[in-house]
């Protein structure tokens, strides 16, 4: 009987999580997170809370995942709406890749996101410019 991690099943479950508590529940005690704007931290609930504050409707699809017994790499597409004040919502889409390591219980011990932070920034700037122009 194999004890190998079922990464496809993990990916589908990950796609369904909603909110900071659900994201934090993926992690083992002391599990760490890092991305291009967040240095390594164990406060993964805050990471999710901060993301929700910027993109309340954030949704992430795992496009492809590969891994071993205690690690995986996945490519993803995230979509959301950025809303500044009373202005119109600006839809964004971004792509990235994530490297995760898990413990024997399948809980994340290390999560590192790789993404181009200019991708959503450019989309937001373009959306704001269009709104100012009346379009």
Which ranges hold each PLM region?
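A solvent-exposed, acidic/Ser-Thr-rich amphipathic alpha-helical stretch
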Residues: 4, 13, 18-71
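A beta-strand edge to alpha-helix "cap/lid" segment located at domain peripheries
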Residues: 49-135
């Amino acid at each position: 009987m194999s004890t190998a991690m079922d990464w496809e099943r993990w990916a589908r479950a990950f796609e369904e999580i909603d909110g900071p508590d659900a994201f934090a529940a993926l992690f083992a005690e002391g599990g760490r997170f890092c991305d291009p704007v967040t240095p390594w931290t164990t406060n993964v609930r805050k990471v999710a809370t901060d993301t929700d504050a910027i993109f309340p409707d954030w949704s992430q699809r795992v496009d492809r995942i590969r891994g071993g017994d205690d690690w995986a790499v996945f490519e993803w597409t995230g979509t959301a709406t950025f809303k500044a004040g009373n202005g119109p919502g600006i839809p964004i889409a971004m792509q990235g890749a994530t490297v995760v390591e898990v413990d024997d219980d399948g809980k994340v011990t290390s999560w590192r996101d790789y993404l181009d932070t200019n991708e959503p920034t450019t989309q937001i700037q373009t959306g704001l410019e269009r709104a100012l122009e009346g379009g």
